Amino acid sequence: MNNSTIDNPQIGKDVIESLTLGMYEVCRFIYREYIQNAADAVDKAIDLSLLKKGEEAIHITIDTDHRKIIISDNATGIEQGNVMRVLRNIAHSTKKRGEDKGFRGIGRLGGLGYCSKLTFETSYYGEPSKSIMTWDSELLKYIINDRNNSEEAVQVLAQVTKLDTKKEDTKVGNKNENFDY
């Protein structure tokens, strides 16, 4: 064993399984997580005067033809410069316990156990482009089950996530959380 292994703590890839694929035994709990995230975003938009009380909206769409479930809101979105920090990192939430509905920064990943790809699409109010963070659940399962390699948790996160940007077609922030099952 080299000194860097002894001196520096390591977190193996199996912890990712506990926080994603193994978080919920019953899939319906993931919907609560995404709706709570949307509700927190709507509350923030009202607090920032981006929306007036009564203008907020959370929509749930089940698209059986394309095998997708979409949960969207008309709230603040995430600033493009913060998307990687907010949507790829785990347990780095800025939400406040007792004030926000969610606060740990892990619930959004529970959907990975029930889909092939988990997509977070967001645009911050007034920004001209939207960010699309995709988590590859199939690749995540493959990496975790591969006992011949012992990747660190952060290496796995880098491998299974992808960030794209596209021109936004509206000035109102949108946040969609999609499951391709």
Give the label of every model feature segment:
Residues 1-179:
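GHKL (Bergerat-fold) ATPase N-terminal catalytic module, capturing the glycine-rich phosphate-binding loop
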